[in-house]
Amino acid sequence: MSALLSPDQLEADLRAIGARLYHDQHPFHALLHHGKLDRGQVQAWALNRFEYQRCIPLKDAAILARMEDPTLRRIWRQRIVDHDGNSATDGGIARWLHLTDALGLDRTLVESGRALLPGTRFAVQAYLQFVSEKSLLEAIASSLTELFAPNIIGQRVAGMLKHYDFVSSDALAYFEHRLTEAPRDSDFALDYVKQHADTVEKQALVKAALHFKCSVLWAQLDALHVAYVTPGIVWPDAFVPDRDASRVAA
């Protein structure tokens, strides 16, 4: 039987999971960050990623609803504000739509979800189901991928600005905000997990939760790579560059 880890040992194990499995290791991100994708492939990434962005506040609301401690709720609800904003023109979702607008995608099509890859939809729904059904500790632990976000954000912004003349720093404003939001959120979640994962069984659960979340992010990139890189198998109802870039959903 495994021994109980100290909080710092648990953190080291969690960081090791991220170092091995976080989606910065996926080949699709290497292509994106090094300028190896064309405009249509970048559009496909942004359109499909919106489904994940759209559901982040739904995920956080599901977690919030299970928190009985008002102090904890006050801290966690900031995540919802960060993405929903205080108006229709503010917040992470609005900033992601600003990116898809800048890439030439029709906003109605993006928001409708009609052109998503099935793999994108299934991965995001699996994440929502996970945080709704698992323990509060596991749900919070699943958010710990944010520990690794600042590094990939730095790579993404620098790489996209360097290699794609159709991308501007203004279009990438979403990522600038996440450079401060993600560390704040992950610091809190990590402290919570280290404090509350106080048995061998709970420590195994939080590590499994982070492992699962890494698989959710990886699966979304698998779907994009199969459809838009190689072998190029696109779901018939999914986004097709050129044909759909300005298509308005019926």
Swiss-Prot record:
Biological process terms in GO annotation: pyrroloquinoline quinone biosynthetic process; sulfur compound metabolic process
Catalysis performed (reactions): 6-(2-amino-2-carboxyethyl)-7,8-dioxo-1,2,3,4,7,8-hexahydroquinoline-2,4-dicarboxylate + 3 O2 = pyrroloquinoline quinone + 2 H2O2 + 2 H2O + H(+)
Enzyme class, spelled out: oxidoreductase
Disulphide bridges: none
Residue ranges that the Swiss-Prot or TrEMBL entry lists as coiled coil: none
UniProt KW keywords: Oxidoreductase, PQQ biosynthesis
Pathway where it operates: Cofactor biosynthesis; pyrroloquinoline quinone biosynthesis
GO molecular function: pyrroloquinoline-quinone synthase activity
Its EC number(s): 1.3.3.11
Function: Ring cyclization and eight-electron oxidation of 3a-(2-amino-2-carboxyethyl)-4,5-dioxo-4,5,6,7,8,9-hexahydroquinoline-7,9-dicarboxylic-acid to PQQ.
Family, as annotated: Belongs to the PqqC family.
Protein's UniProt name: Pyrroloquinoline-quinone synthase
Organism: Xanthomonas oryzae pv. oryzae (strain MAFF 311018)
Gene name for this UniProt entry: pqqC
